[in-house]
């Protein structure tokens, strides 16, 4: 089945590419998610008009993503106060949700799946480096400092 891509698909093509895919893949995945349309004469003419709009939207989304990444990268460290025992072990743990709340307080939007806690939730007082991966090629580290508030 010949289709026209409305969005970029890794290993398939870019916006506006006319490609051949299996009918089931197109019907069950690409069409419902509005990623592609059937490559008919009518759609080819329609798409030429729509192509410029889609490219501008894609550029704008990339610009916003890069801007958000710069804001995240400007964060060097965040402090979180929590209860801990005398040996520095927390009563509970600090996970991605706590870190997101502290980052939101600084006016930066971040999603849970972007935070990579390599050793699981943070359970001790001190400095911990965590990775934030916005996109496959946009990754940075910030320092989370856990302090005892007792």
Curated annotation (Swiss-Prot):
Any single Pfam family the record assigns to this protein: Ribosomal_L9_C
Gene Ontology terms: cellular component: ribonucleoprotein complex; ribosome
Disulfide bonds: none
Bilayer-crossing regions: none
InterPro entries, sorted: Ribosomal_bL9, Ribosomal_bL9/RNase_H1_N, Ribosomal_bL9_bac/chp, Ribosomal_bL9_C, Ribosomal_bL9_C_sf, Ribosomal_bL9_N, Ribosomal_bL9_N_sf
Superkingdom to which the source organism belongs: Bacteria
PROSITE patterns: RIBOSOMAL_L9
Keyword set, alphabetical order: Ribonucleoprotein, Ribosomal protein, RNA-binding, rRNA-binding
Family of the protein in this entry: Belongs to the bacterial ribosomal protein bL9 family.
Family annotation (PANTHER family): 50S RIBOSOMAL PROTEIN L9
Name the record gives this protein: Large ribosomal subunit protein bL9
Species, as recorded: Wigglesworthia glossinidia brevipalpis
């Amino acid at each position: 089945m010949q289709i026209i891509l409305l969005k970029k698909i890794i290993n398939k093509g870019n916006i506006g590419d006319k490609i051949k895919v299996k009918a089931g893949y197109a019907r069950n995945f690409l069409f419902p998610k509005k990623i592609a349309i059937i490559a008919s004469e009518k759609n080819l003419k329609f798409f030429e008009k729509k192509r410029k709009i889609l490219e501008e939207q894609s550029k704008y989304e990339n610009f916003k993503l890069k801007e958000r990444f710069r804001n995240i990268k400007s964060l060097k460290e965040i402090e979180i106060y929590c209860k801990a025992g005398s040996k520095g072990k927390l009563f509970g743990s600090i996970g991605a949700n706590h870190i997101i709340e502290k980052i939101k307080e600084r006016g930066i939007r971040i999603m849970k799946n972007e935070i990579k806690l390599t050793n699981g939730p943070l359970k001790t007082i001190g400095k911990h480096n965590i990775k934030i991966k916005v996109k496959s090629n946009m990754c940075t580290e910030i320092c989370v400092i856990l302090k005892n508030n007792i």
